[in-house]
A protein has these predicted regions:
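A short beta-strand micro-motif
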Residues: 3-9
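A short, exposed loop/beta-hairpin motif centered on an aromatic-Gly-Thr core
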Residues: 12-24, 29
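Short, mixed-charge low-complexity intrinsically disordered segments
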Residues: 34-71
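The Walker A/P-loop phosphate-binding site
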Residues: 67-167
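Structural motif
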Residues: 121, 200-204, 249
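Catalytic-core regions built around general acid/base machinery
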Residues: 137, 226-241
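Conserved inter-motif catalytic segment of the P-loop NTP-binding fold
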Residues: 144-230, 320
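Phosphate-binding/switch region of NTP-binding enzymes
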Residues: 237-336
Length: 336
Protein backbone atom coordinates (compact mmCIF):
# COMPACT_ATOMS: atom_id res chain seq x y z
CA UNK A 1 0.00 0.00 0.00
CA UNK A 2 1.22 3.51 -0.83
CA UNK A 3 -0.02 6.92 0.27
CA UNK A 4 0.21 10.25 -1.55
CA UNK A 5 -0.37 13.89 -0.72
CA UNK A 6 -2.28 16.00 -3.25
CA UNK A 7 -0.86 19.14 -4.85
CA UNK A 8 -3.09 21.29 -7.06
CA UNK A 9 -1.40 22.28 -10.32
CA UNK A 10 -4.49 23.95 -11.79
CA UNK A 11 -8.23 23.32 -11.80
CA UNK A 12 -7.84 20.21 -13.98
CA UNK A 13 -4.46 18.79 -12.97
CA UNK A 14 -3.22 17.38 -9.67
CA UNK A 15 0.17 16.03 -8.63
CA UNK A 16 0.35 13.12 -6.18
CA UNK A 17 3.51 12.94 -4.08
CA UNK A 18 4.43 9.70 -2.34
CA UNK A 19 4.84 9.93 1.43
CA UNK A 20 7.55 7.23 1.42
CA UNK A 21 9.72 7.94 -1.64
CA UNK A 22 10.16 10.43 -4.49
CA UNK A 23 7.44 9.00 -6.73
CA UNK A 24 5.11 11.55 -8.33
CA UNK A 25 1.93 10.94 -10.30
CA UNK A 26 0.18 13.48 -12.53
CA UNK A 27 -3.60 13.18 -12.58
CA UNK A 28 -5.68 15.06 -15.15
CA UNK A 29 -9.31 14.80 -16.27
CA UNK A 30 -8.48 11.92 -18.62
CA UNK A 31 -7.13 9.74 -15.82
CA UNK A 32 -9.53 6.96 -14.75
CA UNK A 33 -9.11 7.93 -11.07
CA UNK A 34 -9.61 11.65 -11.63
CA UNK A 35 -12.91 11.71 -9.74
CA UNK A 36 -11.32 10.15 -6.63
CA UNK A 37 -8.48 12.67 -6.53
CA UNK A 38 -10.66 15.65 -7.42
CA UNK A 39 -13.17 14.87 -4.67
CA UNK A 40 -10.38 14.51 -2.10
CA UNK A 41 -8.69 17.73 -3.24
CA UNK A 42 -11.94 19.71 -2.95
CA UNK A 43 -12.67 18.42 0.54
CA UNK A 44 -12.80 20.89 3.43
CA UNK A 45 -10.14 18.81 5.20
CA UNK A 46 -6.70 17.60 4.12
CA UNK A 47 -6.94 14.13 2.58
CA UNK A 48 -4.45 11.55 1.31
CA UNK A 49 -4.79 9.18 -1.62
CA UNK A 50 -4.22 5.50 -0.77
CA UNK A 51 -3.45 2.89 -3.43
CA UNK A 52 -3.53 -0.67 -2.11
CA UNK A 53 -1.86 -3.79 -3.50
CA UNK A 54 -4.85 -4.64 -5.70
CA UNK A 55 -4.71 -1.22 -7.36
CA UNK A 56 -7.78 0.21 -5.61
CA UNK A 57 -7.71 3.97 -5.04
CA UNK A 58 -9.34 5.53 -1.97
CA UNK A 59 -8.92 8.72 0.03
CA UNK A 60 -8.52 9.13 3.77
CA UNK A 61 -8.26 11.98 6.24
CA UNK A 62 -4.76 13.16 7.15
CA UNK A 63 -5.01 12.05 10.78
CA UNK A 64 -1.22 12.08 11.29
CA UNK A 65 -0.62 15.59 9.95
CA UNK A 66 1.43 14.52 6.94
CA UNK A 67 0.72 17.82 5.16
CA UNK A 68 1.98 19.84 8.10
CA UNK A 69 5.02 17.74 8.90
CA UNK A 70 8.49 19.19 8.38
CA UNK A 71 11.94 17.57 8.43
CA UNK A 72 13.23 17.39 11.98
CA UNK A 73 15.61 20.25 12.76
CA UNK A 74 18.02 20.45 15.67
CA UNK A 75 16.27 22.27 18.48
CA UNK A 76 17.85 25.46 19.77
CA UNK A 77 17.58 26.69 23.33
CA UNK A 78 14.62 29.01 23.74
CA UNK A 79 15.32 32.30 25.46
CA UNK A 80 12.19 33.32 27.37
CA UNK A 81 11.56 36.93 28.39
CA UNK A 82 8.80 37.68 30.89
CA UNK A 83 6.97 40.99 30.71
CA UNK A 84 5.06 43.19 33.13
CA UNK A 85 2.04 45.16 31.96
CA UNK A 86 3.36 48.28 33.72
CA UNK A 87 6.48 48.15 31.54
CA UNK A 88 4.65 47.96 28.21
CA UNK A 89 4.72 50.98 25.90
CA UNK A 90 1.02 51.13 24.98
CA UNK A 91 -0.08 53.44 22.18
CA UNK A 92 -2.84 55.75 23.47
CA UNK A 93 -4.66 55.41 20.14
CA UNK A 94 -5.63 51.87 21.16
CA UNK A 95 -8.15 53.38 23.58
CA UNK A 96 -9.75 55.75 21.05
CA UNK A 97 -12.87 53.95 19.85
CA UNK A 98 -14.28 54.34 16.34
CA UNK A 99 -17.94 55.27 16.65
CA UNK A 100 -20.60 54.95 13.96
CA UNK A 101 -23.03 57.36 15.61
CA UNK A 102 -25.69 54.66 15.92
CA UNK A 103 -26.99 52.41 18.71
CA UNK A 104 -24.53 49.81 17.41
CA UNK A 105 -21.80 51.65 19.33
CA UNK A 106 -23.37 50.68 22.67
CA UNK A 107 -23.81 47.14 21.40
CA UNK A 108 -20.18 46.72 20.32
CA UNK A 109 -18.25 47.75 23.43
CA UNK A 110 -18.50 49.39 26.83
CA UNK A 111 -16.38 52.28 25.48
CA UNK A 112 -18.76 52.68 22.54
CA UNK A 113 -17.90 51.64 18.99
CA UNK A 114 -15.10 49.58 17.47
CA UNK A 115 -11.87 49.40 19.45
CA UNK A 116 -8.55 49.49 17.53
CA UNK A 117 -6.59 46.27 17.29
CA UNK A 118 -9.54 43.94 17.90
CA UNK A 119 -10.95 41.06 15.86
CA UNK A 120 -14.67 40.38 15.50
CA UNK A 121 -15.94 37.18 13.87
CA UNK A 122 -19.47 37.28 12.47
CA UNK A 123 -21.46 34.19 11.48
CA UNK A 124 -24.99 33.74 10.19
CA UNK A 125 -27.21 32.00 7.67
CA UNK A 126 -27.02 32.96 3.97
CA UNK A 127 -29.28 35.91 3.19
CA UNK A 128 -29.67 37.12 6.76
CA UNK A 129 -27.82 40.35 5.94
CA UNK A 130 -24.29 39.88 7.28
CA UNK A 131 -22.46 41.64 4.46
CA UNK A 132 -25.13 44.34 4.10
CA UNK A 133 -25.23 45.48 7.72
CA UNK A 134 -21.46 45.26 8.22
CA UNK A 135 -20.67 47.16 5.01
CA UNK A 136 -23.08 49.90 6.06
CA UNK A 137 -21.23 50.24 9.38
CA UNK A 138 -17.94 50.28 7.47
CA UNK A 139 -19.24 53.03 5.17
CA UNK A 140 -20.27 55.19 8.13
CA UNK A 141 -16.73 55.07 9.50
CA UNK A 142 -15.28 55.70 6.04
CA UNK A 143 -17.48 58.81 5.73
CA UNK A 144 -15.95 60.06 9.00
CA UNK A 145 -12.46 59.80 7.52
CA UNK A 146 -11.42 56.40 8.86
CA UNK A 147 -9.37 54.19 6.57
CA UNK A 148 -11.82 51.38 5.82
CA UNK A 149 -11.29 48.42 3.47
CA UNK A 150 -13.61 45.71 2.18
CA UNK A 151 -12.07 42.40 1.05
CA UNK A 152 -14.58 40.53 -1.10
CA UNK A 153 -13.78 36.91 -1.85
CA UNK A 154 -17.41 35.96 -2.60
CA UNK A 155 -18.91 38.77 -4.70
CA UNK A 156 -17.46 40.44 -7.80
CA UNK A 157 -17.74 44.02 -9.04
CA UNK A 158 -21.11 43.47 -10.75
CA UNK A 159 -22.58 41.84 -7.64
CA UNK A 160 -21.55 44.81 -5.53
CA UNK A 161 -22.67 47.46 -8.03
CA UNK A 162 -26.27 46.29 -7.65
CA UNK A 163 -26.26 47.54 -4.06
CA UNK A 164 -25.34 51.14 -4.91
CA UNK A 165 -28.88 52.46 -5.41
CA UNK A 166 -29.89 51.32 -1.92
CA UNK A 167 -26.58 52.11 -0.25
CA UNK A 168 -24.88 54.99 -2.11
CA UNK A 169 -22.27 55.48 0.64
CA UNK A 170 -20.66 52.21 -0.38
CA UNK A 171 -19.50 53.78 -3.64
CA UNK A 172 -16.34 55.32 -2.18
CA UNK A 173 -15.16 52.41 0.01
CA UNK A 174 -11.85 50.91 -1.22
CA UNK A 175 -12.50 47.26 -2.16
CA UNK A 176 -10.20 44.35 -2.94
CA UNK A 177 -11.90 41.78 -5.16
CA UNK A 178 -9.83 38.70 -4.44
CA UNK A 179 -11.28 36.83 -7.41
CA UNK A 180 -9.22 39.10 -9.67
CA UNK A 181 -6.09 37.49 -8.23
CA UNK A 182 -7.11 33.81 -8.16
CA UNK A 183 -4.35 32.93 -10.63
CA UNK A 184 -1.98 35.75 -9.68
CA UNK A 185 -0.79 35.15 -6.12
CA UNK A 186 -3.79 36.15 -3.96
CA UNK A 187 -1.61 35.67 -0.87
CA UNK A 188 0.76 38.43 -1.98
CA UNK A 189 -2.18 40.64 -2.98
CA UNK A 190 -3.66 40.43 0.52
CA UNK A 191 -0.32 41.03 2.22
CA UNK A 192 0.37 44.03 -0.02
CA UNK A 193 -2.97 45.79 0.48
CA UNK A 194 -2.97 45.28 4.27
CA UNK A 195 0.56 46.68 4.45
CA UNK A 196 -0.88 50.07 3.42
CA UNK A 197 -2.44 50.40 6.88
CA UNK A 198 -6.17 50.45 7.68
CA UNK A 199 -8.34 51.35 10.65
CA UNK A 200 -11.02 48.76 9.90
CA UNK A 201 -11.11 45.81 7.49
CA UNK A 202 -14.20 43.74 6.61
CA UNK A 203 -13.52 40.33 5.04
CA UNK A 204 -16.21 38.30 3.26
CA UNK A 205 -15.59 35.53 3.92
CA UNK A 206 -12.81 33.77 5.83
CA UNK A 207 -13.58 30.44 4.14
CA UNK A 208 -13.38 31.85 0.60
CA UNK A 209 -10.16 33.73 1.34
CA UNK A 210 -8.71 30.57 2.86
CA UNK A 211 -9.70 28.42 -0.12
CA UNK A 212 -8.43 30.92 -2.70
CA UNK A 213 -5.02 31.24 -1.07
CA UNK A 214 -4.80 27.52 -0.29
CA UNK A 215 -5.38 26.49 -3.90
CA UNK A 216 -3.03 28.98 -5.52
CA UNK A 217 -0.23 28.71 -2.93
CA UNK A 218 -0.42 24.91 -2.49
CA UNK A 219 -0.63 25.26 1.28
CA UNK A 220 -2.57 22.97 3.58
CA UNK A 221 -5.83 24.25 5.04
CA UNK A 222 -4.41 24.54 8.55
CA UNK A 223 -1.29 26.38 7.34
CA UNK A 224 -3.43 28.80 5.33
CA UNK A 225 -5.60 29.48 8.36
CA UNK A 226 -2.53 30.09 10.53
CA UNK A 227 -1.08 32.43 7.89
CA UNK A 228 -4.26 34.54 7.82
CA UNK A 229 -4.58 34.68 11.62
CA UNK A 230 -0.91 35.66 11.92
CA UNK A 231 -1.47 38.35 9.27
CA UNK A 232 -4.36 39.82 11.25
CA UNK A 233 -2.34 39.70 14.47
CA UNK A 234 0.54 41.53 12.77
CA UNK A 235 -1.72 44.42 11.76
CA UNK A 236 -3.53 44.43 15.13
CA UNK A 237 -0.12 45.39 16.52
CA UNK A 238 0.32 48.21 13.99
CA UNK A 239 3.02 46.57 11.87
CA UNK A 240 2.18 48.41 8.64
CA UNK A 241 3.22 51.60 6.83
CA UNK A 242 0.84 53.88 8.74
CA UNK A 243 1.29 52.12 12.10
CA UNK A 244 -2.48 51.50 12.22
CA UNK A 245 -3.77 49.10 14.86
CA UNK A 246 -6.16 47.46 12.42
CA UNK A 247 -9.52 46.11 13.55
CA UNK A 248 -10.84 43.15 11.56
CA UNK A 249 -14.47 42.15 11.02
CA UNK A 250 -14.41 38.67 9.49
CA UNK A 251 -17.49 36.91 8.14
CA UNK A 252 -17.60 33.15 8.76
CA UNK A 253 -19.70 30.67 6.83
CA UNK A 254 -22.02 28.28 8.65
CA UNK A 255 -22.14 24.52 8.15
CA UNK A 256 -25.45 22.73 7.66
CA UNK A 257 -25.35 21.92 11.37
CA UNK A 258 -25.29 25.61 12.25
CA UNK A 259 -21.66 25.83 13.42
CA UNK A 260 -19.10 28.14 11.82
CA UNK A 261 -16.69 26.68 9.27
CA UNK A 262 -13.11 26.71 10.58
CA UNK A 263 -11.05 25.49 13.50
CA UNK A 264 -11.69 26.45 17.11
CA UNK A 265 -8.59 28.64 16.90
CA UNK A 266 -10.74 31.14 14.98
CA UNK A 267 -13.00 31.53 17.98
CA UNK A 268 -10.27 31.43 20.63
CA UNK A 269 -8.13 34.14 19.01
CA UNK A 270 -11.04 36.51 18.33
CA UNK A 271 -11.87 39.43 20.60
CA UNK A 272 -15.55 38.86 19.94
CA UNK A 273 -17.86 36.34 18.27
CA UNK A 274 -21.17 37.60 16.89
CA UNK A 275 -24.10 35.80 15.29
CA UNK A 276 -26.65 37.44 13.01
CA UNK A 277 -29.89 35.47 13.02
CA UNK A 278 -33.49 35.44 11.90
CA UNK A 279 -36.16 35.70 14.56
CA UNK A 280 -38.85 33.19 13.71
CA UNK A 281 -39.12 32.04 10.11
CA UNK A 282 -36.40 32.69 7.56
CA UNK A 283 -37.04 35.80 5.44
CA UNK A 284 -39.42 37.10 8.13
CA UNK A 285 -37.50 40.42 8.01
CA UNK A 286 -37.01 40.17 11.79
CA UNK A 287 -33.28 39.92 12.33
CA UNK A 288 -30.97 40.48 15.25
CA UNK A 289 -27.29 40.56 16.15
CA UNK A 290 -25.96 38.94 19.32
CA UNK A 291 -22.52 38.44 20.84
CA UNK A 292 -21.79 35.05 22.37
CA UNK A 293 -18.26 36.21 23.24
CA UNK A 294 -17.07 39.78 23.73
CA UNK A 295 -13.97 40.76 25.67
CA UNK A 296 -14.76 44.46 25.34
CA UNK A 297 -18.54 44.55 25.80
CA UNK A 298 -21.71 42.73 26.72
CA UNK A 299 -22.84 39.27 25.60
CA UNK A 300 -26.26 37.70 25.08
CA UNK A 301 -27.88 41.08 24.29
CA UNK A 302 -29.92 41.22 21.08
CA UNK A 303 -29.91 44.23 18.75
CA UNK A 304 -32.78 43.95 16.27
CA UNK A 305 -32.73 45.50 12.80
CA UNK A 306 -34.52 45.35 9.45
CA UNK A 307 -33.56 46.08 5.85
CA UNK A 308 -36.60 48.08 4.81
CA UNK A 309 -35.39 51.13 2.85
CA UNK A 310 -31.85 50.77 4.10
CA UNK A 311 -30.83 49.48 7.51
CA UNK A 312 -32.89 50.36 10.56
CA UNK A 313 -31.74 49.42 14.06
CA UNK A 314 -34.42 49.11 16.73
CA UNK A 315 -32.79 51.38 19.29
CA UNK A 316 -35.95 51.71 21.40
CA UNK A 317 -36.24 47.96 21.85
CA UNK A 318 -32.53 47.58 22.61
CA UNK A 319 -32.68 50.31 25.27
CA UNK A 320 -35.84 48.83 26.76
CA UNK A 321 -34.30 45.34 26.92
CA UNK A 322 -31.20 46.68 28.68
CA UNK A 323 -33.36 48.50 31.21
CA UNK A 324 -35.42 45.37 31.86
CA UNK A 325 -32.22 43.37 32.41
CA UNK A 326 -31.04 45.95 34.95
CA UNK A 327 -34.35 45.82 36.82
CA UNK A 328 -34.25 42.01 36.96
CA UNK A 329 -30.66 42.08 38.21
CA UNK A 330 -31.59 44.59 40.91
CA UNK A 331 -34.53 42.46 42.05
CA UNK A 332 -32.28 39.42 42.33
CA UNK A 333 -29.85 41.37 44.51
CA UNK A 334 -32.65 42.35 46.86
CA UNK A 335 -33.78 38.73 47.17
CA UNK A 336 -30.30 37.47 48.06
Amino acid sequence: MKQYTIKTIDHEVYQLNSTTDNEQLTINTAHPKWHVVNKAACSAENRLIKINESGRWTSLKDYNGVYDSNPTQPTKPVEVQLQKLDDLDIDDSLFESMQTGTVVDKFLSTEGGFLPGTNINIAGSPGVGKTTVLLELLSQLHTQGKRALFISAEMNQIDMARYLKRFPRWGQIPMLFLGDYCDHNPKAALESVLEQGWDLVLTDSFTEVNDTVKEESNMSRSKTEKWFLDLMSKHNLGSNKLKKHTTFMTILQLSKGGTFVGSNKLSHMATAMMYIKWEGNENSNRRYMEFVKNRVGQVNKKLYFNLREGINFDEARYTRDLLNDELVAEERKQLE
